[in-house]
């Protein structure tokens, strides 16, 4: 992926540490999904925010304080994800013991496994397809040089801190839509989507008031003050992406709502749209606009996905309402 030779070793170390954290990622998604399924979407969100804040604090301690560099960043991610899993386990044992398997519940049920695979595999493929576009964009950015690699990495860490809220609103909508579909209360689904969009827009205003004036200061959490060029480029990335956060918020709400309604194959196609958009940006926009083109990689992908998801959700919603009638 055109990784510069001078950062290849560090990138390899960080990647290996990320792979080591995969069991924690799987465990968190499994446990938080179970908690949400019982109607509690707040607690997993609080745990995720806690883990994100701990990640940032550990980054400062391990990278700036102890000078561990990329190893410190990887260890911080590893530890913060582990903490989120422990918090989920603690909450289940304390408040939701119904989720702890007992007796025959520990036995495998082939029919239930089949249902889970039918819903889960398309969702997994969706993220894999989206990742192809991200790899293409990363490759195009790496070819620009180490300054841009550092700017991209720093901006992504801050971006994920802010955008995890959109992700959790979407995940909550998946549970909400699934529950109301089971009860055939389709009007509540429409009300929930509208309410979540309003919540998303309020949160967007909050992020704008933070990111637009303070993006440079945020970047200094991960970048040495002496690397002014990296700070400038990373802040530019954050500001451009922030303008399009409503598009990202709408994407997560509609995509997860469609998944909650049982049409994972349909939501997977939005991932294809994202992949096509990022590949197009990598092949044409980055060569023409350099770093500015990279900054528009995510926004273009979000808009393309929305152009598919909006009519797809409206069609699906009308289709389901006709079935009820």
Regions picked out by a protein language model, each given a short descriptive name:
Residues 55, 63, 130, 134-138, ...:
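Juxtamembrane/transmembrane-helix interface segments of polytopic membrane transporters
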